Amino acid sequence: MAKDYSRTQRIGDQMQRELAQLIQREIKDPRLGLVTITGVEVSRDVAHAKVFITVMGQDDAGKIALNMEILNDAAGYLRMLLGKSMKLRSVPQLHFHYDESIRRGAELSALIERAVAEDGRRHGDETED
């Protein structure tokens, strides 16, 4: 059975691809790090879009906040460029959000590895007795 793939999802996917290229090519701010767009959620009325990003190699909250500020300041410019590249009647307003899921996933993975190693040590100690 085919999965429902709504118009807003298609727009979000296309916006994700377009924004990745536009940020790389058009935003000339040297303070901007290596930004990865992890997802775009478009509202049902296509008036707003939440753009989720990560900054490669940045764990410092101050540097992440600076990157977010740069992108939010450039949101109008990026929206105008999106309007030229996408065939939409109205281009959604862009709202950039930092995506915590990758960092949380890495933390959970480290916790699981630690728990498995601890369990292995305990299990190894029990079999030697």
Curated annotation (Swiss-Prot):
GO terms for molecular function: ribosomal small subunit binding. Monomer. Binds 30S ribosomal subunits, but not 50S ribosomal subunits or 70S ribosomes. NCBIfam families: rbfA. Belongs to the RbfA family. It is found in: Cytoplasm. GO terms for cellular component: cytosol. This is Ribosome-binding factor A. It comes from the Bacteria. The gene is rbfA. One of several proteins that assist in the late maturation steps of the functional core of the 30S ribosomal subunit. Associates with free 30S ribosomal subunits (but not with 30S subunits that are part of 70S ribosomes or polysomes). Required for efficient processing of 16S rRNA. May interact with the 5'-terminal helix region of 16S rRNA. It comes from Pseudomonas aeruginosa (strain ATCC 15692 / DSM 22644 / CIP 104116 / JCM 14847 / LMG 12228 / 1C / PRS 101 / PAO1). Pfam families: RBFA (PF02033). Its main location: cytoplasm. InterPro entries: KH_dom-like_a/b, RbfA, RbfA_dom_sf, Ribosome-bd_factorA_CS.
